Amino acid sequence: MNRNGVITCALGGLLLSQAATHQAMAADLSVQVNQFFQQQYPDKESQVKVVIKTPQNQWPQCDMPEITLPANARPWGNISLSVRCDGVRRFIQTQVQVSGHYAVAARQLAAGEKMTLQDIKMKQGRLDTLPPGALLEPNFAQGAVSLRQINAGQPLTRNMLRRLWIIKAGQDVQVLALGEGFNVNSNGKAMNNAAIQDNVRVRMASGQIVSGTVADDGTVHILL
């Protein structure tokens, strides 16, 4: 083989090596970005799929990229993700698809109706396609009043509902401490407004401050 042939082979080998290295790092970044978003949804019921929309040749290349979400970023949908490599920060455009449970109306509700647990149904589906403020659990809707007509099967959102304070700050409340095999009743004074299933702080007669959950009947439950 002549000298030119040797140089050509060496150059070709170098380019192949660089391409392989880039592909490996790109694959690593894709895995790391997916793992980053998986950690945002630790519950086993949520399924996360991340599509990186930025062309692969524009991805930063380093072994340990520092990945962060911008402040006030939505947890799904189109997200501009900050990736810092060797002190240089780039933004990678991603589409985060999340499937999980969300709350829908179990029946048609008229404006002004108070919702009970029987009016709420949990459904499995894509969370990133839901309207803003969609409810991922029923607690917020329980005991709330609908601000407009809600159709059966319609996803529930925060701006559809007005929560009713079942406990108001300064109100005397009954506190029920629930232990294994025993219950203890006592009284205290609520320190904040709270709706059903909200957390509320209570100052007891002794001066001690405890936190509990508001039950349907307005009592405060504390698990021991």
Curated annotation (Swiss-Prot):
The keyword Signal applies. GO terms for biological process: bacterial-type flagellum assembly. Its main location: periplasm. Coiled coil: none annotated. It is found in: Periplasm. Residues 1-26 form the signal peptide. Belongs to the FlgA family. Involved in the assembly process of the P-ring formation. It may associate with FlgF on the rod constituting a structure essential for the P-ring assembly or may act as a modulator protein for the P-ring assembly. This is Flagella basal body P-ring formation protein FlgA.
